Amino acid sequence: LAETYYHSLSFLYSHDEFVEQISKHIEAINYFFGQRPRVFRNTELIYNNDLAALIESMKCFDAIITEGADHILGYRSPNFVYQPKGCENLKLLLKNYSLSDDIAFRFSNRDWPQWPLTADKFSRWVSNVNGNGNVVNLFMDYETFGEHQWEDTGISSFMRAMPGEILKLADN
């Protein structure tokens, strides 16, 4: 996953600066992890079709991830892979904000009707997407872990267990 190097709003002000920052971030990811990012994420998931066209023109990304906002999607689901208008190859991955926010903000809220959130319960929610999508994109900021959800909430154990619980279900 790549983004702007300085977590900036450079796309809004200078496309040259924007491309330069992305290139710098790609270099950093490659240096530290030995990987070339294939998905782009703009600062705070800010998106428009012009951004997608610029990202596609860079020819180094397969997809871009952004919000799955209800007011934009209307009747459509964030749980499908879309193609940005005007793009031929770039895919658009939409954040499932409801399931993401269940982890990021509601996980340790004892007043939440679904508390406690366990890995097996969450895996069933993910599996329930079947028939209304073929992908669930969960996206949480790093501040989820340590600022919103402290270690003593069980968030780390939940995150370790979740993939295995999802894969246990036959439809996944």
Question: Where are the model-predicted features located?
Answer:
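Acidic, His- and aromatic-enriched active-site or binding-groove loops in soluble protein domains
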Residues: 1, 35, 56-94
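Short catalytic/ligand-binding loop motif for oxyanion handling, primarily in non-cytosolic enzymes
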Residues: 8-12, 47-51, 72-74, 101-102, ...
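Residues lining hydrophobic/aromatic ligand-binding pockets adjacent to catalytic sites
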Residues: 18-36, 42-71, 107-116, 124, ...
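Catalytic grooves of carbohydrate-active enzymes
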Residues: 88-172
